Curated annotation (Swiss-Prot):
The gene is Abcb6. It comes from Mus musculus (Mouse). Induction: Up-regulated during erythroid differentiation and heme biosynthesis. Up-regulated by cellular porphyrins (at protein level). Up-regulated in red blood cells under anemic condition. Induced by sodium arsenite in a dose-dependent manner. This is ATP-binding cassette sub-family B member 6. Its EC number is 7.6.2.5. The keyword Cytoplasm does not apply.
Amino acid sequence: MVTVGNYCETEGPAGPAWTQNGLSPCFFFTLVPSTLLTLGVLALVLVLPRRRREVPAGPEELSWAAGPRVAPYVLQLFLATLQMALPLAGLAGRVGTARGVRLPGYLLLASVLESLASVCGLWLLVVERSQARQSLAMGVWMKFRHSLGLLLLWTVTFAAENLALVSWNSPQWWWARADLGQQVQFGLWVLRYVTSGGLFILGLWAPGLRPQSYTLHVHEEDQDVGGNQGRSTDRRSTWRDLGRKLRLLSSYLWPRGSPSLQLIVLICLGLMGLERALNVLVPIFYRDIVNLLTAKAPWSSLAWTVTTYVFLKFLQGGGTGSTGFVSNLRTFLWIRVQQFTSRGVELRLFSHLHELSLRWHLGRRTGEVLRIVDRGTSSVTGLLSYLVFSIIPTLADIIIGIIYFSMFFNAWFGLIVFLCMSLYLILTIVVTEWRAKFRRDMNTQENATRARAVDSLLNFETVKYYGAEGYEVDRYREAILKFQGLEWKSTASLVVLNQTQNLVIGLGLLAGSLLCAYFVSEQKLQVGDFVLFGTYITQLYMPLNWFGTYYRMIQTNFIDMENMFDLLKEETEVKDVPGAGPLRFHKGRIEFENVHFSYADGQETLQDVSFTVMPGQTVALVGPSGAGKSTILRLLFRFYDISSGCIRIDGQDISQVTQISLRSHIGVVPQDTVLFNDTIANNIRYGRVTAGDSEVEAAAQAAGIHDAILSFPEGYETQVGERGLKLSGGEKQRVAIARTILKAPDIILLDEATSALDTSNERAIQASLAKVCTNRTTIVIAHRLSTVVNADQILVIKDGCIIERGRHEALLSRGGVYAEMWQLQQQGQETVPEESKPQDTA
């Protein structure tokens, strides 16, 4: 009968890691299987969430030829399955050849851990093959290679089998093949070596992901491959292309163009390194104090050691490294670097948004774009803070701790720290992923609860009309109860996470403390070493308590940063051609020659539009809504590029000159004037930001609004409110006219500038506009035909075509569309609409 003895072959909890010309089998088969299982679980955690986010393939069908190469993939599956069975076969071989010998406990643990690690590898192999076929079925191009986690697992497995060769001369291993047991174990090692080597080589080739040929059959009614790509992209894993994201992020770490800030970055990195040294030195001096007290050392030595310890503790802080002098100094110095980074990101985004076309802006919600900008900026600074000053230092502390305990204590202490930290990180990631759904549900319900309250209060009068106060309170109570139920789940899952972390910390501390106590009892370590171990481990676990928060925040920030970079990748539709020069303005002759334009493919907004505006002339564009009148102005201002034809100013194609020079010669008074939430003076000065106060007032006088401005309590310093809502329609139009007068453009574009005003305001503003347009080339879009009767030329536009042109009298005598429009408007002016009659408001 075979029984289980001590964990290792030696007496006591553990023996040395290196003994008898080789690694201790106990140490080796504890380190390797635990490392492999850690890598396998981490790889699964990173891949499986992405699998859940994948969209199932639709009606597309993937031909067999596009599938994986069958024979190599079957071999890969066979080797992965064999690798899973070999550890258990090795344990069975040990049991069969033991014959009354008590088996050490590490053999049982190693067999279980190795098998579980192989299960993770086999699972990943199948999952990635399924994802590859699904991606091909959706017409999404992918790189035919395994995930980094799976490749790393196979690489470390093969490297571990090679590592065993360093113990070739050790009698503890099976290399001598002295008996049946060693012969069996040697044969199993050969199988493991061949298996792991085969998986490593096949993994680099990835036959399960590489198609023989790319043949995609799609049903005719579902040939929108682009749509599938969009869906796939929107659901991509947060950790996908991690290397590219880190490279993009690192570009913001180094403040280019600022030597002083670059020096500060180096100082901050140096301080971060000093913090790592302090985290080692503080427990060491604490150990020395305990040893000196135990040995009853002289007061001078004790006082010096205590003073040094307290000074180091002052530099380090209250045990966590987050409140000490060094950390606070680093935080203080980093403020300028963080501001430089956020300023650079914000300005880059803001500048890019202004470079994008009007078409892009009209197709996006401004609030959504601004959220991307805000979150993108915060994500860059947040990721730099979390990664550089939280995650990397914590991982560095773990590595330093493993190296320190392995070198100055025993390799088993390093192994204990490694196992506990690995288990801690894995469980934190797994539980954090699990509880994410509770947090999402809670946030959704919180928004719904708030929306219900807001909706009820906004409809206060309606609630009173129907006496529904009790009903609204009941609905709100129901929403609160539902929110609190989800809040309980989220909080309870957080408690589970904290208790799981606490359990791992306790188990690690228990194992290390027992081992340390054993070595102290054997007089291999001192009492101070026991204190050092407990202090160092507790200090090490402190920042790890926030690892779950860091993990979620990094995920969120990566998503926000990805959205920001997607925004930066938006192509600028209207660009200056290479070598474009400024517009050379002479007299202001405008020519449209055979212009075609469409906002969307297949729907032409303008068709073969041709006309000429001579210098100083006024041309009016009239016609029904949607005919293309405003489009003509936008094309002249070059908000869009035309599909075909040519637009010239003084004989120069506007697509061949710089946009800024073109627009500097054009002034626009739109139908709906939007003012900035600023003073009246600054809104007028926006026409020419370098203008002085006297020039602003002169422009206001020319626009006929100077006296009205002076009647305000604060005069020109009056705030107009958001979008100018504190001013009347006529006042806003006059501010827009004053702004255009101050710009002093050579060409004026009036887009139904008075259509929304009453008759008295319209006449007054028409007089102001007449002054602005004197001796300037002008194009007017008019809704009321009476405002353009004196135009040099009137163009009647319908369905994107010019159907009539001429002066007012000639068009009336022709009896066409213009004459019909004129007659209808004259009849409308003679009849007072019912809505305009005075109403009894009593």
